[in-house]
UniProtKB/Swiss-Prot annotation:
It comes from Anaeromyxobacter dehalogenans (strain 2CP-C). Belongs to the thiamine-phosphate synthase family. It comes from the Bacteria. Pfam families: TMP-TENI. Binds 1 Mg(2+) ion per subunit. The lineage of its organism: Bacteria, Pseudomonadati, Myxococcota, Myxococcia, Myxococcales. It catalyses: 2-[(2R,5Z)-2-carboxy-4-methylthiazol-5(2H)-ylidene]ethyl phosphate + 4-amino-2-methyl-5-(diphosphooxymethyl)pyrimidine + 2 H(+) = thiamine phosphate + CO2 + diphosphate; 2-(2-carboxy-4-methylthiazol-5-yl)ethyl phosphate + 4-amino-2-methyl-5-(diphosphooxymethyl)pyrimidine + 2 H(+) = thiamine phosphate + CO2 + diphosphate; 4-methyl-5-(2-phosphooxyethyl)-thiazole + 4-amino-2-methyl-5-(diphosphooxymethyl)pyrimidine + H(+) = thiamine phosphate + diphosphate. PANTHER family: THIAMINE-PHOSPHATE PYROPHOSPHORYLASE (PTHR20857), THIAMINE-PHOSPHATE SYNTHASE (PTHR20857:SF15). This is Thiamine-phosphate synthase. Condenses 4-methyl-5-(beta-hydroxyethyl)thiazole monophosphate (THZ-P) and 2-methyl-4-amino-5-hydroxymethyl pyrimidine pyrophosphate (HMP-PP) to form thiamine monophosphate (TMP). The gene is thiE.
Length: 222
């Protein structure tokens, strides 16, 4: 069931806009610090092989950095998002179904879902997701792709069709991020474009500024 517009998650959903950085690896807290320092609007904590306790600790530390500055979502683990006091969870193909995550988290936390087609995106929203990740938009800079890149035209179609934020993901770099915003994405999700840079904080600042310029060009209010 779609989430009520009166819920707290609706307020969080309204804040989904701008650079969305996925952190993990050896030092996700340092990565998040740099990304938030550069103006990232959302952080996704993705620590695939880490023990639950390590994910919980890192998420709590990132939340302390992000207060009043960025949303923090946990990858996969709705239980850890709830325990940490995060803003929500992002679910992939092998994670909890959206309705079960919503039942665990209640109406106040964000539930995002990976999608690759407009049909999948509509289904995720119908099941109770607040927003969708959509992609890959371009060839990925960090991993092999299960499907061909979707491109900007498909992103624009999805963004126009959905009554909820679309987080674009897949191969987005500094040269692409303004076009992603102009296509209607609420957020541009990145890893290597920020975390692979010599100065991640400066890279985040450049990408956030470019995203805002693209959003302004399509006539949206920053």
């Amino acid at each position: 069931m779609p989430v009520s517009e009166a819920s707290v998650s609706a307020g969080r959903r309204a804040r989904l806009g701008g650079l969305y950085v996925i952190v993990g690896g050896a030092d996700p807290v340092a990565q998040a610090r740099a990304a938030i320092g550069g103006g990232a609007r959302a952080i996704q904590v993705r620590m695939k092989d880490a023990p639950a306790g390590a994910v919980l600790e890192a998420t709590r530390r990132i939340l302390a950095l992000a207060t009043g500055r960025a949303l923090v979502l946990v990858n996969d683990r709705a239980d850890l998002a709830l325990l940490a006091g995060a803003d929500g969870v992002h679910l992939g193909d092998d994670d909890l179904p959206v309705p079960e995550a919503r039942r665990l988290l209640g109406p106040d936390l964000l539930v995002g879902r990976t999608t690759r087609t407009l049909e999948e995106a509509r289904a995720a929203l119908a099941e109770g997701a607040d927003h969708v990740g959509y992609g890959p938009i371009f060839a990925s800079r960090s991993k092999a792709l299960p499907v061909p890149p979707r491109g900007l035209a498909a992103l624009a179609e999805v963004a126009r069709a959905l009554p909820a934020p679309v987080v674009a993901i897949g191969g987005i770099g500094l040269d692409d991020v303004a076009a992603v915003a102009r296509a209607g994405a609420a957020c541009a999700a990145v890893i290597e474009a920020v975390l692979g840079a010599a100065d991640p904080e400066a890279a985040a600042a450049r990408m956030q500024a470019a995203f805002e310029a693209g959003r302004a060009a399509r006539g949206a209010t920053p």
